[in-house]
Amino acid sequence: MGERANFLKGEVRKKFEAAAMSAIDAAMLVDAVVHLGIDHCFREEIATALRSVHEDEEGEFGSCDDLHTVAVRFLVLRQHGLWVSADVFDKFRDDKGSFSKSLLCSNPRGLLSLYNAAHMAVTPEEKVLDDAIAFARSHLVEAMIGELRSPMVEQVSRSFDIPLPRFSRRLESMHYIAEYGQEEEGHDAQILELARLEFELVRSLHLRELREICSAEYGATGEEAFAFIANMTENAWRKINQACMEMDPAMLPAFKVAVVDLSRSIEIIYLGGKRDAYTFGSNLKDLVTSLFLKPCA
C-alpha cells in the first residue's frame, strides 16, 4: 500500500509541475487535494501553484465568468493566507448590487462554492460576502427541493450544518473521497486512489499509536490495549449513570438527556468498539432498516 501511495504521489507531483497547466487548472488541482485531505503530501507544490493563482488577478481569472471557478480561487487563496478582495464577486451582481438570479440560479455547483467561499470573510465590512451567503443559501434550498442530485445534495446539506471552511478536515475528506468520483467532470482517478490509500494509511497509523500509547502507559500488549479501552468505555458509562443520579435537580432535564443520548449515539456508531460504522455506513444498514423500514412484530 505504501509503495503504491508513493508512486501516486510522484504522478500527482507531475500534474503540479506540468508546464502547460493554467492558473485555473492550478486552483482546481489545489482545491481537489485539499478537499480530499492529501495536501500535506504536496506543501511545496501547493505553495508554488498558489503563487501563480494569486498573481493571476487580471489574467485568466480576470476574464473568467464562471462562478464556481472564481469562488474556488477565492477560497483556496484565503485558506492559505493569501489576500484576495471580495470585489471579485462584483461581476456576478447587477446594477443594484444584488446577485444576479438570471446568471446564477441555474448553477448549483457555483452557488455551493460561493456559499463556502463567503465563509472566509475576515471583516464585518465585507458585506458582499454576507449577501452571498444569504443569496446562495436561499437558492440552494430551492434546488434541494427540485433538481439537485447526489452527491451535491449531501454536500449542500453538510455545508448548511457547518460551512466547509469550519468543518473537520478529516471528516470532510472521508465524505468527499466517496463523492469525488461521482462528479460529472474534473475528477482524477490517480488523485482519488491516492486519497483512499492515504486515508487508510493514516487510520492504520492512528490505531497503531493508540495501541502503543496504552502499551507504554500500562505495559499492555496490543490485544490487552484494546481490552483496556473497552473496559474504559464500560467505566465511562458507569460514571455517566452515576453523574445522572447525582445531578443537581436545578439542572435542566434536557441537558441530562442530551449527554446520555450523545453517549448512546457514539456507542451505536462504533457498535461497542467492534466495528467502525461512522466510516463504513454499511455497518449500520441493518439497524437503520429495522428502525425505519421494518414494521414492529
From Swiss-Prot:
Disulfide feature: none
Organism of provenance: Zea mays
Matches recorded under SUPFAM superfamilies: Terpenoid cyclases/Protein prenyltransferases (SSF48239), Terpenoid synthases (SSF48576)
Subcellular location: Cytoplasm
InterPro entries recorded: Isoprenoid_synthase_dom_sf, Terpene_synth_N, Terpene_synth_N_sf, Terpene_synthase-like, Terpenoid_cyclase/PrenylTrfase
Pfam families found in the cross-reference section: Terpene_synth
UniProt record, GO biological process: terpenoid biosynthetic process
Domain of life from the UniProt record: Eukaryota
Function: Inactive selinene synthase.
Gene Ontology CC terms: cytoplasm
Keyword Cytoplasm attached: yes
Biological classification of the source: Eukaryota, Viridiplantae, Streptophyta, Embryophyta, Tracheophyta
Entry keyword tRNA processing: no
Stated family: Belongs to the terpene synthase family.
A single MF term (Gene Ontology): terpene synthase activity
Oligomer status and interactors: Monomer.
Protein name: Inactive beta selinene synthase
Swiss-Prot/TrEMBL keywords: Cytoplasm
